[in-house]
Swiss-Prot record:
The active site is at residue 133. InterPro entries: NAD(P)-bd_dom_sf, NmrA-like, NmrA-type/Isoflavone_red_sf, PCBER-like. NADP(+) binds at residues 11-17, 36, 45, 137. Pfam families: NmrA (PF05368). Keywords: Allergen, NADP, Oxidoreductase. It catalyses: (-)-dehydrodiconiferyl alcohol + NADPH + H(+) = (S)-isodihydrodehydrodiconiferyl alcohol + NADP(+); (+)-dehydrodiconiferyl alcohol + NADPH + H(+) = (R)-isodihydrodehydrodiconiferyl alcohol + NADP(+). Oxidoreductase involved in lignan biosynthesis. Catalyzes the NADPH-dependent reduction of phenylcoumaran benzylic ethers. Converts dehydrodiconiferyl alcohol (DDC) to isodihydrodehydrodiconiferyl alcohol (IDDDC). One of its GO terms (biological process) is lignan biosynthetic process. It is an enzyme of class 1 (oxidoreductase). This is Phenylcoumaran benzylic ether reductase Betv6.
């Protein structure tokens, strides 16, 4: 059996982090999670930490802002996967510095898991978040650290349960608001699958110093196509309200945080088409479902079925 790298996840109790921790543990990689003392005693995150222990995950106490704790943790593993949240993206320079000092890390996955930030046409406030991720890429490359960037596009759990309708808790059954003309195609991936594909990439030479795009054929839909699929499932035609780009841009400017960030990402994806408006070239990227055709991913159609 091939050697399986030891993997450390930073931000493992966060939204996408927990899926990556679980995928790593279940795939037989020796799995480590960096946790702060405060996380263990947190009522919600503490439960997750207990779940990790049950999966055989080793907890390493440390903190993004404690350089020595990072170096000590990194010396025990081969691969570092960062899944830190929005507010800590810029602070990943601290991870890079500790990787340089530790000197043994075979691969670094910075916190990405969305659009390919080198190929976006975003407005503020999403523009700055994307630019911060791009800066972390450049810093990683400049330091000569081996890397993989996972561009997993949309989390299914963010979009599909409500079809991006604000204030709803299930998909709409009367009317639906559609951004732009509804024709730009986007990609929707279930979080478990993002975890699975990410871990598969860890020891794969084909993904070294590349962007891994998670774009399975059955998960690429325009907004109009998703609405049509949902209408077919519920046997009903919805009233469609199209929001022109100018109106969406105005809404972004007038909305509070985090609504403005979400709307700006929706603008990038559904108006500018930033998930699908470029070709993946072998010089910079590979596509996960082509690399790992044996992974049985959840399709958009299967995902929506639970809400019918």
């Amino acid at each position: 059996m091939a050697h399986k790298s030891k993997i450390l996840i930073i931000g493992g109790t966060g939204y996408i982090g927990k899926f990556i921790v679980e995928a790593s543990a279940k795939s037989g990689h020796p799995t480590f999670a960096l946790v702060r003392e405060s996380t263990v005693s947190d009522p919600v995150k503490g439960k997750l930490v207990e779940k990790f222990k049950g999966l055989g995950v080793t907890l390493l106490h440390g903190d993004l802002y404690d350089h020595e704790s990072l170096v000590k943790a990194f010396k025990q593993v081969d691969v570092v996967i960062s899944t830190v949240g929005h507010l800590q993206l810029a602070d990943q320079v601290k991870i890079i510095a500790a990787i340089k000092e530790a000197g043994n890390i075979k691969r670094f996955f910075p916190s990405e898991f969305g659009n390919d930030v080198d190929r976006v046409h975003a407005v503020e406030p999403a523009k700055t978040a994307f630019a911060t991720k791009a800066e972390i890429r450049r810093k990683t490359e400049a330091e000569g650290i081996p890397y993989t960037y996972v561009s997993s596009n949309f989390f299914a759990g963010y979009f599909l349960p409500t079809l991006a309708q604000p204030g709803l808790t299930s998909p709409p059954r009367e009317k639906v608001v559609i951004f732009g003309d509804g024709n730009a195609r986007a990609v929707f991936n279930k979080e478990d699958d993002i975890g699975t594909y990410t871990i598969r990439a860890v020891d794969d030479p084909r993904t070294l110093n590349k962007i891994v795009y998670i774009k399975p054929a059955k998960n690429i839909y325009s907004f109009n196509e998703i609405v049509a699929l949902w209408e077919k499932k519920i046997g009903k035609t919805l009233e469609k309200i199209y929001v022109p780009e100018e109106k969406l841009l105005k809404d972004i400017q007038e909305s509070p945080i985090p609504i403005n960030v979400i709307l700006a990402i929706n603008h990038s994806v559904f108006v500018k088409g930033d998930h699908t408006n470029f070709e993946i070239e072998a010089s910079f990227g590979v596509e996960a479902s082509e690399l790992y055709p044996d992974v049985k991913y959840t399709t958009v159609e299967e995902y929506l079925q639970q809400f019918v």
